[in-house]
Design a protein with these regions (language model features):
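N-terminal mature-domain "stem" immediately C-terminal to a signal peptide or N-terminal signal-anchor/transmembrane
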Residues: 1-32
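Acidic/His-rich structured neighborhood in mature extracellular/periplasmic domains
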Residues: 23-169
Length: 169
């Protein structure tokens, strides 16, 4: 129930009045991608275990942080999020982790959205990294506006350092 509202309003950007027809359009357009994802992600234990390990480190390093209770996977539009934090869950958009050579990313539309240097990280092994990046961003919101480039680089380096310690392997 909680994620459904987030999915419909924030990911699909559906207005309540247009929900049913737009939802049907999305469903029919993305059903083939969903079917492909079920074969690619038959076995998600490895990614789920790494996220759980990251949660254990989070609990150790940030004991007051409220960890997500659930891990949810979904298929969203190609230009949607790779991971989303809700009040009680972390949701992973599998459409951005189908493998770097997936036709979705190598197509003209895919390359316009995500050039090769970006889509090379659209592998299942990057799911835990994306999840932990999102959590680190929740703990330390971006404050780079108006800062010099070197300060922004240092800020990003600090985030990478924290993520490296949450996912040590």
């Amino acid at each position: 129930p909680g994620f459904t509202t987030v999915f419909l309003s924030n990911i699909l950007a559906l207005m309540p009045a247009s929900e049913s027809s737009d939802l049907k359009s999305f469903y029919s357009a993305y059903l083939p991608l969903y079917k492909q994802s079920t074969s690619i992600f038959k076995e998600q234990k490895k990614q789920a275990q790494k996220i759980e390990q990251g949660f254990q480190y989070l609990k150790h390093y940030f004991p007051s942080y409220q960890l997500p209770n659930k891990l949810i996977t979904f298929i969203g539009p190609i230009n949607s999020f790779g991971s989303i934090l809700t009040e009680d869950a972390i949701a992973i958009g599998l459409q951005l982790f189908m493998g770097k050579d997936h036709p979705l990313y190598t197509s003209e539309e895919g390359q316009a959205l995500y050039p090769s240097y970006v889509s090379r990280k659209f592998e299942p092994s990057y799911i835990p990294v994306s999840a932990m990046n999102n959590i680190v961003l929740d703990i330390y919101p971006e404050q780079m506006s108006g800062k010099p480039l070197i300060a922004q680089i240092v800020e990003l380096g600090k985030r990478m350092y924290v993520v490296d310690h949450l996912l040590p392997q």
